[in-house]
Amino acid sequence: RMGAATYNNYNVSLTHYHRTSDRFAFSTGGFYEHTGGFFENSARNNEKVDKSNAGGGRFRGIYLPSSNLKIDMALSYEYSDQGGYPYYYTGITPSAIAKAKENGKEMTEDRADYIGKISYNDRSSYRRGLLNSGVNIEYQANNFILSAVTGYQNLNDRMFLDQDFTERDIFNIEQKQRANTISEEIVLKAKPGKRWQWATGAFGFYQWLHTTGPVLFKEEGVKSVIENNANSAFEEVSAKPGAPTMGMTVHNPTLSVGGTFDTPTLSGALYHQSTFNNLFIEGLSVTAGLRLDYEKISMKYNSLSTPIDFGFDFHLAMGPNQINLSDQNMKAPASFVGKLSTDYVQLLPKFAIQYEWKNQNNVYATVTRGYRSGGYNIQMFSDLSQTELKNSMMNAIKESPTIGQDATWGKTIINMMNQMVPAKEIDVKASTTYKPEYSWNYEAGSHLTLWEGRLWADVAAFYMDTRDQQLSQFAESGLGRITINAGKSRSYGAEAALRASVTKELSLNVSYGYTYATFTDYVITEEQKDGTFKVTADYNGKYVPFVPKHTLNIGGEYA
């Protein structure tokens, strides 16, 4: 099979099916895809941002040793090299201007020529090699079916991002992941056609994940992000009456904020589900199920940053006395080495009732409890490293022989700095951990078959109550995206779909969905110096991001 489309999109694939005997058959194939890209990067001579190449192959074999035993094997590998991340500049946001005014500052647009343009100087890309393999063994006894599914996955990938997404040479990240995952599921279930349909199973999963993600601050980034931010803080201090004048100079041409992380995950589950058909009356069925989930997540982290070589000047006028102190040869290291772990135990029930009055005509209602795993934000270590670097720089100043340890003014300077530029405490666990997400889901609907089996209709209404909802957002420093928990949200809506066979050759389909998803308890507060908390953002009643309010699909098929 070969195909082509606009914007230099091409694909080719080859598949072979072969049956060697009544007991064994297999299929194998390969593919290659090229995408020319659509979005252009103005900072790289209008280079296509999203061009990509991908290729791979697969094998599947089915072996029947006997009439009641089947072995299904699958193996696939895919390699892809993609451009991406077509983020364009929208200009300074009104909220940023308002926040600056609150802090007594004024923000002006200095990149007006780049508004609406994708413009960053380093090529951003994602490269991945993915191997999947699995074996499904199924044994059919007289009264039950026993199946065992074993899976293995190997992932090697590399993500490179120009993280400032501008034409300036500020900073970038190269994140690499190496993951090995093995899973096993054993299911014992009733054979079809029985009044009592039941299934009991056990599931186990273990993943080894090794991640490296150094952030490289280039010369402009060292100046604008490290040096200028520090001096801005000193300027705020110096603006106070009687305060000293302070200034910092960073000598590093570049600065690497690195990290190596091992985040293994262990998961296991036991579950059972029973469906009682024709309960009390013909066509009425009731389903009840329960799943016990256990999950243990851990993280071993080793985050090391290039020591900052910096100088510091301190000037203070105290009556007739002029204090002028300086040290241009200080070093400030920053590192985090340690481990974290946590585990969760969950009970996830399921209830359903259905009434079917004719084949493929029914009404139903379901209630389920949902759960999404928690985890660790390893990209938060870039923010933590910046905070630790600032703390380390303050400590270096305090320990400097010519400043903090000055025989005459050292103690005075240390006391002043402790009051004006206090060290920030760092809680690695609180800063990097996000909690699981929980939900209760309710749905009622109907499946209808009409027009002598030529028209199918599906309608449903749903309601979802979510707690500790997980959201993706940029870290405060801009160094990567993180997952946060956002209190509570509520979603409700309806869906409808129609599919019609107009003739033997022609079928038409249309579907529509409406979802109203809003936060019900999501308020962000910030602790003030006096210990009180100030509301900085109130999202109650606001829409949950990335949940479309309306979806519509219209299609047809002629064959």
Model-derived segments and their meaning:
Residues 189, 197-199, 203-205, 280, ...:
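Gram-negative outer-membrane beta-barrel transporters
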Residues 39-48, 85-118, 164-171, 214-258, ...:
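Solvent-exposed loop segments that connect transmembrane elements
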Residues 136-161, 362-364, 379, 388-485, ...:
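Membrane-embedded beta-barrel scaffold of Gram-negative outer-membrane proteins
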Residues 1-41, 47-57, 69, 129-133, ...:
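Outer-membrane beta-barrel translocator/receptor signature
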Residues 26-30, 71-73, 146-148, 197-202, ...:
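Transmembrane beta-strands of outer-membrane beta-barrel proteins
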Residues 46, 52-199, 205-211:
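Outer-membrane beta-barrel domain signature, strongest for Gram-negative TonB-dependent receptors
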Residues 2-8, 32-36, 77-81, 141, ...:
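Transmembrane beta-strands of outer-membrane beta-barrel pores
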Residues 21-22, 33, 64-68, 141-142, ...:
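Outer-membrane beta-barrel channels and translocator barrels
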